[in-house]
Amino acid sequence: MAKMLPPPSQSVPSRPPSWLYIPPRRRHGTFTSSCAFRLSPSSPSSPPPPVLDFQYIQFMDSWIEQTSLSLDLNVGLPSTARRSSAPAAPIKVLVEENFLSFKKDHEVEALEAELRRASEENKKLTEMLRAVVAKYTELQGQVNDMMSAAAAAAVNAGNHQSSTSEGGSVSPSRKRIRSVDSLDDAAHHRKPSPPFVAAAAAAAYASPDQMECTSAAAAAAAKRVVREDCKPKVSKRFVHADPSDLSLVVKDGYQWRKYGQKVTKDNPCPRAYFRCSFAPACPVKKKVQRSADDNTVLVATYEGEHNHAQPPHHDAGSKTAAAAKHSQHQPPPSAAAAVVRQQQEQAAAAGPSTEVAARKNLAEQMAATLTRDPGFKAALVTALSGRILELSPTKN
């Protein structure tokens, strides 16, 4: 009979006895619960295993059921009571904060977009202004160059006119071509008119495609305005004349110089071309032709307006034919008379102190004017020949 173990004490030990063997868990274990244990197998030499008491089995059950061995997944986390005790934020406050932040972000983006648009527009306006200033500077330089070229062309035209008057008359067709060229040059040499400036300013703020069309239209409008401004004033005068008179002279109080004659298609009578004797200072021209309907009527067409006063009648010079007939009573040419009168007025205004210098200048200018006048040469030759014939002794 097995030896009985002494009864256990009333207190439950804190740890199991050393003789209790708990095998490790195996893959195919031999126990299925915490209360099923087996003792180590006894060897033939070892004494038989002791008999387990029911109190130890209760001890093992209580030891295994301790809370420290719990398999709860919430180990170390705050309890539900503590989490529920914290005050939760109101839902209304959270919604308002989210909505206000979104609204503020939208306003900031709109302001940034507006600032970017304004900066781009300022850049475009700055570039346009710079382009307008550059074009204005370029046009100003071109105007200055054209004005200087026009002045030089006027001087050359005066010299060429004087040489032409000495060498002979020029055909009217060439004269008309030259006058048309001079009008074109004057149209190009004039400063830009206000419509052209306004059109250029409007084209500066247009798109590139519109700018080309606007510039072409502005150039055409400016050219049309310039041609209208440069177009001389035209007036006509009808004078009764003798049909047998072929001189085509219309006395209107001014001195004229004939530089050509031509027969037109619509009129069998020739047309005479005259220029004011003060040319090139005075741009007035005159065309005289008999009327195709009435041979007793002379039609005088004036182009331009005189920029000087009408000379007195007693200073009016005669033509070359009249000078040949009345050489001893030949008056000075109109240009020389005008120079003489101007110098006399200046000398009278300056006083006796400058009278000697004025007379010297007057003599030089009169000599230069008379030598350039072909009528003076013819009159001088006629006068000298007539005087020689008068002074020559007769055969009687």
UniProtKB/Swiss-Prot annotation:
Is Protein biosynthesis set as a keyword in this record?
A: no
Coiled coil feature spans: 101-135
Induction field: Induced by biotic elicitors (e.g. fungal chitin oligosaccharide). Accumulates in response to M.oryzae.
In this chain, composition skew of type Low complexity spans 162-172
GO cellular component assignments: nucleus
| Pfam families reported in the protein's UniProt record | WRKY (PF03106)
An example GO BP is: defense response
| Biased segments, Basic and acidic residues type | 306-317
Give the annotated DNA-binding region, as residue ranges: 245-311
- What SUPFAM superfamilies does the database record attribute to this sequence? WRKY DNA-binding domain (SSF118290)
Give the GO molecular function terms: DNA-binding transcription factor activity; sequence-specific DNA binding
- Phenotype of the disrupted gene, per the record: Increased basal resistance to rice blast mediated by M.oryzae.
Gene3D superfamilies assigned: WRKY domain
The molecule here is called WRKY transcription factor WRKY28
Organism name: Oryza sativa subsp. japonica (Rice)
